[in-house]
Amino acid sequence: MIRRLPILEGRLQPALILCLILLAVPAAGRPAEVHAPDVKVRLVTDEADMALAILNERAERGEASPQSWERLWKSEGFVRLKKRQEAFGAKDVEKDFRDFLGSAKPLAQRDALRQALELWKHLGVPAAAQRAAAYLPPGIPLRATIYPVIKKSVNSFVFELDTNPAMFVHVDPQKSSDSLENTLVHELHHVGLAGCPKPPDFDRMSAAQKKAFDDLGAFGEGLAVLAAAGGPDVHPHATDTPEAWLVWERDVAGFSVDLRRLEAFFRDILAGRLPAEEENRQLISFIDAEGVPQGPFYTVGWKMAAMVERARGREGLVKTVCDPRTLLAAYNEVAADHPRRAGEGLALWSPDFLAALAPPHPRGG
């Protein structure tokens, strides 16, 4: 399942006796954890548990008790979600949740939401974390708390990647467990990638080179697609609909054209020809195909990474993930030997473009 670049951002059972809710809900919200040398991922469902409890109380009694609302406000998931929303300028977050959970739509969906949340609770979080970590360099930590949340907006996003990484994932009744796990791997890989150090030459880069380097990080979408699939020989949409499969095949077929379009975009950044607003508009256009989170950063990034892994193994690919410039160079070397078809090989990154991404070597020793 393909997910959107996280940097672009871009609430259960009533009781005839209230104390039964109090006893049941905390157990449901207990976090599941997975630990490994560089992996610590928690799944915390308390916000969704409390939201479902409110919906169930509404169904049983017509309204939820003040105590139930207070438990929602104090849940770890809601506290962090509110902090994130307020960081983006939201006002009256609690009122918005009251209005949403008091409306007809979530009440009508409560059985479907309960089933969707149960899928999350039985999801293979340890396996998903290890699949994401398999495409990260040794020593890069993968730390995250995953919050399946019931909320009005259907988007999912990350927060506080530099300090206490959180993933907020919309509880979607339409998702299968396989699709959810692929989404989880994809987003966890983004979280891990955010822990990469800057390259040694970053401080010597010009402002334009730093912009280009940061935007090259969007190829992390393709890397995350590969990690979620589990390898270069597994179709990225193996768990999706035939329609999604066909759209992916259509877009991958435009690889060479899209590579040249991306190079032109980065050349404009390096030359200082793009105002910030236009740069962002074009960047988004490369990760959003007709409203679908897919585009050249996904397809070109995936194909480059898949070819490098096939030719050099996963270890060879993983060496490139923290510096996307090395991925482009590795792809060029692999693609130069790729079999030709119809008299034309795969498009390559221009040598002068790759050279322009690096700052001059320092003088002297």
Q: Which functions belong to the PLM regions below?
A:
Residues 98-248:
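Acidic/His-rich structured neighborhood in mature extracellular/periplasmic domains
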